[in-house]
Amino acid sequence: MSLVDLGKRLLEAARKGQDDEVRTLMANGAPFTTDWLGTSPLHLAAQYGHYSTAEVLLRAGVSRDARTKVDRTPLHMAAADGHAHIVELLVRNGADVNAKDMLKMTALHWATEHHHRDVVELLIKYGADVHAFSKFDKSAFDIALEKNNAEILVILQEAMQNQVNANPERANPVTMATPFIFTSGEVVNLASLVSSASTKTTSGDPHASSTVHFSNSTTSVLATLAALAEASAPLSNSHRATANSEEIIEGNSVDSSIQQVVGSGGQRVITIVTDGIPLGNIQTAIPAGGIGQPFIVTVQDGQQVLTVPAGQVAEETVIEEEAEEAEKLPLTKKPRIEEMTNSVEESKEGTERELLQQRLQEANRRAQEYRHQLLKKEQEAEQYRLRLEAMARQQPNGVDFAMVEEVAEVDAVVVTEREMEERETEVTGAVGTAEPHTGVSMETVST
């Protein structure tokens, strides 16, 4: 049996999970080949969940990070199909937990995409980067949000709070004062998560300033806040207690709202200050140890402002109305899009101008040709006119051209009257009388 056949049989045995057949084929020298998609035996064993087969192949030295033609590793296969035991086996054998395929998606992305909660927990346990972004600028949190998977959302949110952001360039730090609660109605408690970006707030004494890191990496944070605010039950005004780590801002009765705009790195952070309601009687809503969850505050104009207690890790985000959707585009892409649009318009104008010039040149060329043809016709007409005039001048000379032509046609002998008389005299003088020749036609021409 050839090596090619041995390699094909090894792929099929790995797909079916036939451990003994895999051992026999490798003992007979079967190469670690791949199919036309670049799928290795370990890929197939991981995809179909054959733990023992994968273990045999790893012990035999198969590459644990082998890549298909779309750069998928066996860990991608196992995570996408929900084989947690295979995932753990691969990670314990040194597989790259943050390997990215052609779409720049990690195993955590694929596990979240297919709702495999146990695989997500396992990957996070072994250090998967929850801040990794795919080719479509989406993190695992964004995918879980699109799939409406609340359990995975909670897991990822906790992991993001505990894990240092691996993409610090996506966060623009903004220095603000100690967090406040801005309210003009009811305070809604968020039961779990807020955003996919890792943010930190630090506080010392009550009057010290805190630093809040904002991130524009997640485009669906606003939708998360709105959905969670609707899902959470509003707290009654009678269930309020004093929040020692928060400061309440009460707006002036005359100036009901003040808007402060803080810009940093091209971003805009809007703080809305409205008529405040002191939180003096909250008893059951806030735990004795302090506020354990973030708060979202709804103001009258439909905006929502998230605020957190001092020392808690969360993100402060302003949700504006749908008119601000245009600002969701990455700020670095807007000038590029405008430049591309301008260049396209300029190229269109240049093309149209060149086309018009070509048409004008073609019209001029045809007009020149028509002008030459007209001049030539005029010259020919002039020549015909001159010929006719010459012929008309030759007619009055007294020469009968038609008669001459007729004489030429019958081959007649043309003699004058004088010649006839002389001829008759000669004949009569010699013979006396003579008859004219009968075979010759004679014509008298008088001048």
From Swiss-Prot:
Cystine pairings recorded for this chain: none
PANTHER family (UniProt xref): ANKYRIN REPEAT PROTEIN, GA-BINDING PROTEIN SUBUNIT BETA-2
Assembly and oligomerization: Heterotetramer of two alpha and two beta subunits. The C-terminal is necessary for the formation of a heterotetrameric GABP-alpha-2/beta-2 complex, and also facilitates homotypic dimerization. Interacts with ADGRB2.
Superkingdom as given in the UniProt entry: Eukaryota
Residues with the Phosphoserine modification: S253
Pfam family for this entry, one: Ank_2
Cross-referenced PROSITE patterns: ANK_REP_REGION, ANK_REPEAT
Record keywords, A-Z: ANK repeat, Coiled coil, Nucleus, Phosphoprotein, Repeat, Transcription, Transcription regulation
MF (Gene Ontology): identical protein binding; transcription cis-regulatory region binding
Renumbered ranges of ANK repeats: 5-34, 37-66, 70-99, 103-132, 136-166
CC annotations in GO: nucleus
Parts forming coiled coils: 345-395
Subcellular compartments: Nucleus
Function: May function as transcription factor capable of interacting with purine rich repeats (GA repeats).
Gene Ontology biological process terms in this record: positive regulation of transcription by RNA polymerase II
Protein name, as recorded: GA-binding protein subunit beta-2
Disordered: annotated span: 418-447
Database matches in InterPro entries: Ankyrin-SOCS_Box, Ankyrin_rpt, Ankyrin_rpt-contain_sf
